[in-house]
């Protein structure tokens, strides 16, 4: 009887141990499943944000620095942009503009305070859009075309759905074959307008073979 009782107690102990092990294992599995689910949800949200967010390029205009356009080069550029459909707010202070003529690649950054939000009668005129005077070869300024959310702070401008701005930059860092500063005729320019999150706006155009106007549509 004592032997049978001992065997019964031993079996009970083994059974309890098995139950405890199973419970611990189940807890680990449930915890892991919960972690993986949360991670998958976070990844899904991030992917959705990446796909839906981004910058759309509307038009690109170039400005020739000569009263006789055929004798000049493009020394200023205005890139008109707005958010993609479904995009969240885009911090323009974190946007990068990349341009290349095949010989040189330039990265432009926003310089705090270079934002113009008044009426525009001549976009490329330094005396009217005065921020041109402080735009360097590697910085860009912002001219506000439409600010639906009134969030275009000079230091931290935010581009939201319904907004349109022109990103203003100088192209005098490029040189023609005859060593003139600016972008000459028949030059292919490629690049991107890259937001911190979301799809980049693609730049890809070739300048006209002859410049007939001081202001021209490039893309």
Curated annotation (Swiss-Prot):
GO terms for biological process: archaeal or bacterial-type flagellum-dependent cell motility. It comes from the Archaea. It holds the Pfam family Arch_flagellin. Signal peptide: none annotated. Its main location: other. InterPro entries: Flagellin/pilin_N_arc (IPR013373), Flagellin_arc (IPR002774). One of its GO terms (cellular component) is archaeal-type flagellum. The keyword Manganese does not apply. Residues 1-5 form a propeptide. It is found in: Archaeal flagellum. Keywords: Archaeal flagellum. GO terms for molecular function: structural molecule activity. Belongs to the archaeal flagellin family. Flagellin is the subunit protein which polymerizes to form the filaments of archaeal flagella. This is Flagellin B4. The gene is flaB4.
